């Protein structure tokens, strides 16, 4: 892959959760291209294995591991396996996350009469759906950090959490996901302070809108034309387009590089085409 710049990660071990997805698979590839031995962790082994195969085909070092970020014992078993093959973790990218339609509202605004309408409003949000979104995003960041940061406390390291522009201003219709990502940004700051005396830097990246498999149904009609929500998103994004997955790589490499960002901890960098800066007028 073509990198915006390179950093020297030779001798480093990087663990990427959610590595089978569009965004974090690119992050895993970039870390490997810079010399890190990369462990790709995902709930669906076939997805992370395919990415690992792409990386090794380029001559870099990577291996796929099946793991559920909500299973503490399972994560500890994966960590032990990674340590035996690659060594202790130096870089952790907490990329697992997602939303659930049961935690969404159908409409942007609650209107008079909606209480009796055939529409899912705030009052109809499914508790299990909401809890699932918070678990996947927040607990799915907490548990891997508990497991892999334990390997860093004697030598230092870097943790990268994946937040969202939702953390700055929540998007309509997705209250649980917005709240969960706001929690990730807050947690990033908390972790940065907590680990500051043992050389573990903790930072975040807040992607704007990227077209992925996960959100394709929200962004594109069956015939490939943009949905009304896509048109609204692009009007609210000063650059007027979606981001490309490789446009997250510059922020990632900067944050994991001790020489470039050794005094940087507790920040979350928005990579959103100006979305979080635009008031709409």
Residue spans for each PLM region:
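Active-site helix of classical SDR
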Residues: 145, 180
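Substrate-binding pocket helix/loop in short-chain dehydrogenase/reductase
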Residues: 103-122, 126-131, 233
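Residue(s) in the substrate-gating loop at a strand-loop-helix junction
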Residues: 164
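C-terminal substrate-recognition "lid" of short-chain dehydrogenase/reductases
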Residues: 241-271, 276
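Conserved glycine-rich Rossmann-like NAD(P)H-binding loop of the short-chain dehydrogenase/reductase
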Residues: 36-50
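Short, small/polar-rich loop/turn modules that mediate ligand/substrate recognition or access, typified
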Residues: 196, 201, 263-265
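Conserved glycine-rich cofactor-binding loop
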Residues: 20-22
